[in-house]
Amino acid sequence: MERKSQVSDTNNNSIPTNVLLKFVGFSVALFTLPLITYFWTLKTLFKGYQTLYAGLSAAVMVNIILALYIVAAFREDSGTPKKDIKRE
C-alpha cells in the first residue's frame, strides 16, 4: 500500500499553477491587446491612412507580446536541480 503512494507521487506529471496562469494571461493578452490597439489607434492617432497604420500598430503589439512571452519562458526555472560534475 505504501509503495503505491510513492509511485503515484513520482509519476505526477501535472503542470504547475504558475505556468498555467502565465500561459492563460499571455493568451488573453495576445487576443485582446492587438484588438484594443487597432481600434484605439484607428479612432485617435492616425488620420488619412487609418487602417494601414492601425493594422501595423496591432502587428507590432503582437510581436511585443510574443517577445515578452519568450523572455518569460527563458527566465522560468525548469525545476530540475543542476548537478556539479567534478572530474578527478
Curated annotation (Swiss-Prot):
Membrane topology summary: Multi-pass membrane protein
Which GO biological process entries does UniProt record here?
vacuolar proton-transporting V-type ATPase complex assembly
Where is this chain's protein located in or outside the cell? Endoplasmic reticulum membrane; Endoplasmic reticulum-Golgi intermediate compartment membrane; Cytoplasmic vesicle, COPII-coated vesicle membrane
**Lumenal-side segments:** 40-53
Return the InterPro entries for the record. Vma21
* A Pfam match: VMA21
Q: What are the record keywords, sorted?
A: Cytoplasmic vesicle, Endoplasmic reticulum, Membrane, Transmembrane, Transmembrane helix
Chief place where the protein resides: endoplasmic reticulum
Write out the GO cellular component annotations.
endoplasmic reticulum membrane; endoplasmic reticulum-Golgi intermediate compartment membrane; ER to Golgi transport vesicle membrane
Function, in words: Required for the assembly of the V0 complex of the vacuolar ATPase (V-ATPase) in the endoplasmic reticulum.
Q: Which family does it belong to?
A: Belongs to the VMA21 family.
| Protein name stated in the entry | Vacuolar ATPase assembly integral membrane protein vma21
